[in-house]
Amino acid sequence: MDSFCLHHYQFSSRLILGTGRYSSPSLAQQSIEASGCEIVTVAVRRFHALHAFTPLINWNRYWLLPNTAGCRTCSEAVRVALLARQLLQHLQQPHQCLIKLEVIPDPLYLLPDPLGTLKAAEILVRKGFAVLPYIYPDPVLALQLEQIGCAAVMPLASPIGSGQGIQHVHSLQLILQNARIPVIIDAGLALPSDASRVMEMGASAVLINSAIALSPSPVSMAHAMKLAVQAGRLAFLAGRMPLSSSAHASSASFGSFL
């Protein structure tokens, strides 16, 4: 499968994993391994919990993508992003500019704040960050974030952790058709078929957490997601057959029987 380029870095896997909601660090580690992912995202507020993963995960094999989950305002997200850069330096991670930006003032539905996200992204881009903003699937906002220099956009498929699957097909299609930066579908994907479908639509990658962590068999689900992402990407590259309003026989209607 072709590689995935994010801020000049190349990745062979188009599946990104979150690390929350697992019943144990060991199960998280096994799921990460089974997924074949290369990027793992961790909330900066949970960096203190990394010590539980340290004996289990070889961080030289994975890119640690910090996120600003839990931030309700622009200023709070900027402060947490700056802290994330310091933490990555302390952990001697080679990439210290990538940040997944989340500004979520709504505690019930966890929908991102478009104005706060745009403002925080502008500040962080000026400070040298490669910003990956988590957004509602708004094509206009996605374009604005691209224009200010974001490294990618991360529109949601449906609310975080809801397992509702793909609820915004048309809006996601508009973003995918017009974006010139990677589009990573984040939040709400519940099944491998969801992951495959957004990859078939042209997504650059997907970020999955709850669908794996809350599965009765997280390791098996992680492997299933890996295969689904690969299948969806191959299908996108191959191209679907043309639509037709009438039926067309796949076998010849004439000739002799053997």
From Swiss-Prot:
Identify the keywords attached in UniProt to this record, alphabetized.
Chloroplast, Plastid, Schiff base, Thiamine biosynthesis, Transferase
Q: Which residues does UniProt assign to the signal peptide? A: none
Q: Coiled-coil region(s) at which residues?
A: none
Localisation? Plastid, Chloroplast
Gene Ontology molecular function terms on file = thiazole synthase activity
User: Cellular component terms, GO, for this chain's entry?
Assistant: chloroplast
The top EC class, named as a word, is transferase
Give EC number(s), comma-separated. Answer: 2.8.1.10
The record's Gene Ontology biological-process terms are: thiamine diphosphate biosynthetic process
Give the reactions, separated by semicolons, that this protein catalyses: [ThiS sulfur-carrier protein]-C-terminal-Gly-aminoethanethioate + 2-iminoacetate + 1-deoxy-D-xylulose 5-phosphate = [ThiS sulfur-carrier protein]-C-terminal Gly-Gly + 2-[(2R,5Z)-2-carboxy-4-methylthiazol-5(2H)-ylidene]ethyl phosphate + 2 H2O + H(+)
Query: Which annotated residues bind 1-deoxy-D-xylulose 5-phosphate?
Result: 161, 187-188, 209-210
Is-annotated flag, keyword Plastid?
Answer: yes
Q: Which residues form the active site?
A: 100
SUPFAM superfamilies hit by this protein = ThiG-like
What pathway does the UniProt record associate with this protein?
Answer: Cofactor biosynthesis; thiamine diphosphate biosynthesis
PANTHER family found in the cross-reference section: THIAZOLE SYNTHASE
**Described function:** Catalyzes the rearrangement of 1-deoxy-D-xylulose 5-phosphate (DXP) to produce the thiazole phosphate moiety of thiamine. Sulfur is provided by the thiocarboxylate moiety of the carrier protein ThiS. In vitro, sulfur can be provided by H(2)S.
Which HAMAP family does the entry link to?
A: ThiG
Family membership: Belongs to the ThiG family.
Q: Could you describe the subunit structure of this protein?
A: Homotetramer. Forms heterodimers with either ThiH or ThiS.
Which named protein is this?
Answer: Thiazole synthase
Q: What is the lineage of its organism?
A: Eukaryota, Rhodophyta, Bangiophyceae, Cyanidiales, Cyanidiaceae
From the UniProt record, report the name of the gene that encodes this protein: thiG
